[in-house]
């Protein structure tokens, strides 16, 4: 064996030897020297000095010996030589004697060593790591344990390294046209298991450590690499297993001249310099590492038919369409470089902060199809790999679709105000709905707000950190207000369409001819839903004014997509009669009806798009959800309406949620905004109330008009509108009674449940929390309770709308009573509705003690229904009637429950105000009575509903 081959067997006591070499040497030593080797730095230095003294002789004697014999001779030689370096015990000084005794006594005790490197998860969580692969912490919490983080060195690079890097960059640029440009020097570097200093990856002539290959190869990987390279030197070919494992890097890939990747406005970066991908084959000892699930196959020359440039990190939404691929898709499945953490420091061509997962390009996801519980998450997995584990992502998707009731669908998350999508379409194991990564990230973000997963609760700061990263990822993938086409979907005249009448519109979505692709049309609807998720959570926080930016973007994009209009009906051959029967979950033709050839009417020319019946219903439900929130927020923030009734007068009303989730698409439905209660979901009982509220908002805006308001308030037209709105409220009240009668009849409901249980046609949407209710009787009782709860909520909001119809929205104007409204008949009628609303609130607390049924919507109606009670308590004090006192007590209890469920500042503030007023009603007048009244006015003055007031938006 040549001298060069001996370089792969470092000396046992070399400070640069691997841990495997140290362990092999230690086993051949005596116990005393074993202790010295492990615990004495002094002995290690002495042995190193002896090795340097006899280094030349050892190299000569070892030539020609087998590897095992060389190891034995080497160990024995150093054992004898090292013993000669120690003095007789009688000649040692007392300090050395004491140290030797301590070392001998501690030989049996375990030696604690400080690990050189923690795994990426433990480093991110600041958790103690044992340095194993996988480590104990990741095994306990089911995390992906990897060591992909780059090793950093303090200080700047030396001039010698910079010069070598510049020379290497020049050499790489010269040899960029050679597909197989690896030389013998590069092979020698591969044999050594590392890259030589003159071959370090460079960018623009400077060394960039972000692409350096990690040096922490384990022992088995080093041994296999060494043996493979020795065989290559002897027989001039690699063993089969060495070829499949890619050797030591990507230098040997036949890329047919495409190893230089060029992007617009970006310097070229050769593919061989992407040596950070080399870390993938070094972690095959970890079954959870990405390389353990890579499909090894032979790389063919050339690139795929898709875009073959690295995605712009500032446009992460484009990564879901075009991926960086190696090999041909027709012959080989694309390799999945998954779970790869982004580099800790951005390279020179990546002007972004790190380590945001949205900045890292995503890759193909085929290898996760056998292990991922919900394949719908494939598009977002590369972006969340460094944020949450896959198992938690699947659990969060379950949380998003979890229902709090087993009888009727009711979202458990307070931030899911209504179901827009079908649960079965998302969670289908083989053919899920095609979603944009931004929508999936927003769903995970919404679910993470309330999930009880240990990953989000320990430590206490984990939820905030994860939610912040998911929020940044969602916004990065959504690209707010920039909804241009993804690479590969751009039409030839897209650049020309981006300039209209001399105005460069850029990527702000004005030219919509890119909707010619089905994925773009679906992606546009997904973007609206993503805006809804962002706006909902922000509206429920203390930053209510900031939420209007997201709501405005959602309303504008929905109007641009014409979601308020019905698409042309199905063609006769779109859905044969033979496909109408069967199980909706098993019959994929029923779950995904045949596409409809329709015209979207966007852009300069109409584009043909395939629209399924399920996608049509998603468009309807998304519009009606935005329609309801527009009216709700108009009351909350004292603003005019954005979406008009005229825009959706021909749009079909939403389906019943139970039928929608079961996939039974109804054929006959009414069109236009509803005014009657039809179901248990938000679309059934709350949407009609919002239709009526929109008319009240328009009436109030006309009353408060700065120039025409006074004349309108005294006109007959105003009185006619008030009477018409009151009539619609009476119609809703009657429909609410009929709804309660229809769903609370025990015999009818019990028979229906029994029949459904026998024929197995009951919709399968039972939540995990409600699966214990297995008998028909328990489902009947739960359905009755759920119906009564819906009726109580509907009754309360209906009474509040009667109060709002009177026009007294502002609490300060009520307390001032400048127009003596408190002595009018209108006040008496409104006061009766205030007491009725308090009684309905008492029923709500009976059926829903924590007010978790609709916490996002309920707060403002509870507040507006309480202003008249506050006025009565403030004016009458101890002379208030018992019904008013009970109503005040109920309102205080309801506000306390709201604070627990969805904690907001205005609810905490008004709870204190009502408690102070209730104490006065009961006769407990404080000494500083006038001061407390003034303090109440100051608090209420923060929330104004006057002409220039902003309501709850502080």
Curated annotation (Swiss-Prot):
GO molecular-function term, one example from the UniProt record: DNA-binding transcription factor activity, RNA polymerase II-specific
One Pfam family hit: Fungal_trans
Disordered: annotated span: 1-39, 51-93, 173-226, 312-332, 566-607, 758-777
Listed CDD domains: fungal_TF_MHR, GAL4
DNA-binding region range list: 119-145
Compositionally skewed regions (Low complexity) per UniProt: 8-21
Cysteine disulfide links: none
Domain of life: Eukaryota
GO biological process per UniProt: DNA-templated transcription; positive regulation of DNA-templated transcription; xylan catabolic process
Comp. bias intervals (Polar residues): 22-33, 82-91, 174-183, 764-777
Record keywords, A-Z: Activator, DNA-binding, Metal-binding, Nucleus, Transcription, Transcription regulation, Zinc
Record has Nucleotide-binding as a keyword: no
Subcellular location: Nucleus
Compositional bias of kind Basic and acidic residues: 64-78, 574-590
SMART domains xrefs: Fungal_trans, GAL4
Family membership: Belongs to the xlnR/xlr1 family.
Protein name, per record: Xylanolytic transcriptional activator xlnR
